């Protein structure tokens, strides 16, 4: 072999080695960025029932969780009785618990939503049946109970909103004017004439508050049957509320059949700008909404329909994602799931313009590749066109749910929910149901 041939072959071998290693590096990067590896699964609770309903990424790089607890032992140290209380847990950037506190009275008090406020504290919303201890007022069976906390969980102020029935606070926003916008269920049957008096169930009930929780306005939306809101977003000219409705009158003009996704756009004083129903002839329920970077909105829930707006039902119930315009026009829709029951409960934006979604699944086929028994928590990431980047199911042989998920400042994810399992992925159950935290990297 002459020197020239030797040099050429050496160059080819070197380039091949570099190319192969370059491809390997790219594959490794894609794996670490896209597969969503489980980092840790943790449960908190006592010998009774606990659940996490909401999680928020905090300004210090950590996160805070709101749920409820019934226990008085193990991880719960400040409860005087076994009635349900709100339960807030604050974690630092290393996933270490910084503090946890319970809030409520001697009645049934359960938290639904937590936000971090611009002053570094928190606001928490849910329902309360108490009129003692932390709760100073109650008008009936249950009221909305909104509590403002400082950065270490001390109560600054608290307010109740309700009538003589079961009124449930569900979603909470801090608005651009530093006030609050809260929505939930009005029990029309016990409202003393508020809302739609022909109603057989509940109305959407929206309340705009100032920075200290005083009511600016209060409005009701719905029809003659059951209308249940689950989430809301602020827009540049008002708010969009999403939930479900089986009404076909009063404020609802185009019900598709039984329960639909019902999306209501209102102005800054609560007047309806437009309302749209999405779904088919089966039961369709919207649970969460977020805005997109292209000026539209994505709504997540579940569907049992296979007609009209729903193009492809995969099983008994599927997670259903729709994208709508600022005017409520359907841009696209997609079902995800398998042959059993699958549902979506939350959606939030990620730093790469994608979305993290949480829910639950009973399927082991279709879009799912594992199930440990009954309902498993289901967490997955999509891009702006609903292409799946990764998905994970977490659970044991009993019932496990994920209710919320967010991305943290360090680009990892936290999903929260509840678990009654003590095997497979979950090995440390303390009672009936435990508060569940899933860390994903």
Residue ranges and their predicted role:
Residues 1-9:
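Bacterial N-terminal signal peptides that target proteins for export
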Residues 8-16:
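Gram-negative bacterial Sec-dependent N-terminal signal peptides
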Residues 19-22:
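C-terminal motif of bacterial Sec signal peptides marking the signal peptidase cleavage site
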Residues 24-441:
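A sequence-level/structural motif corresponding to short, flexible coil/turn segments enriched
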């Amino acid at each position: 072999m002459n020197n020239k041939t030797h040099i050429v072959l050496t160059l080819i071998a070197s380039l091949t080695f570099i190319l192969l290693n370059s491809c390997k590096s790219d594959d490794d990067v894609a794996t670490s960025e896209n597969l969503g590896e489980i980092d840790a699964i943790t449960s908190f609770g006592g010998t009774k029932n606990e659940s996490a309903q909401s999680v928020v990424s905090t300004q210090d790089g950590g996160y805070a969780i709101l749920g409820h607890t019934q226990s008085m032992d193990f991880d719960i140290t400040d409860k005087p009785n076994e009635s349900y209380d709100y339960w807030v847990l604050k974690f630092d950037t290393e996933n270490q618990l910084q503090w946890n506190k319970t809030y409520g009275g001697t009645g049934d008090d359960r938290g639904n939503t937590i936000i971090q406020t611009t002053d570094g504290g928190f606001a928490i919303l849910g329902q309360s049946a108490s009129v003692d201890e932390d709760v100073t007022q109650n008008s009936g069976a249950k009221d909305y109970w909104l509590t403002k906390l400082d950065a270490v969980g001390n109560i600054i102020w608290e307010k109740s909103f309700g009538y003589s029935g079961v009124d449930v606070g569900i979603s909470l926003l801090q608005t651009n004017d530093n006030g609050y916008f809260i929505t939930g269920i009005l029990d029309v049957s016990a409202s003393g004439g508020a809302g739609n008096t022909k109603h057989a169930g509940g109305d959407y009930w929206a309340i705009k508050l100032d920075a200290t929780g005083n009511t600016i306005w209060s409005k009701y939306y719905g029809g003659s049957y059951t209308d249940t809101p689950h989430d809301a977003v602020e827009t540049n000219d008002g708010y969009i509320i999403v939930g479900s409705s089986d009404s076909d009158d009063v404020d609802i003009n185009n019900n598709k059949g039984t329960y639909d996704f019902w999306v209501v756009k209102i102005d800054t004083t609560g007047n309806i700008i437009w309302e749209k129903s999405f779904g088919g002839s089966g039961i369709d329920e919207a649970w969460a909404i977020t805005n997109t970077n292209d000026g539209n909105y994505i709504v997540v829930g579940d569907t049992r329909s296979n007609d009209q707006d729903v193009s492809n039902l995969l099983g008994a119930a599927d997670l259903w994602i729709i994208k709508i315009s600022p005017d409520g026009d359907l841009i696209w829709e997609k079902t995800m799931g398998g042959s059993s029951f699958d549902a979506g409960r939350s959606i939030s934006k990620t730093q790469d313009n994608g979305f993290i979604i949480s829910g639950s699944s009973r399927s082991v086929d279709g879009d799912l590749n594992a199930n440990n028994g009954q309902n498993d928590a289901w967490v997955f990431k999509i891009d702006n066109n609903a292409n799946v980047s990764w998905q994970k199911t977490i659970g044991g042989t009993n019932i496990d749910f994920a209710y919320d998920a967010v991305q943290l400042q360090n680009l990892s994810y936290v999903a929260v929910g509840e678990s009654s399992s003590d095997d497979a992925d979950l090995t440390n159950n303390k009672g009936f149901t435990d508060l569940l935290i899933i860390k994903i990297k």
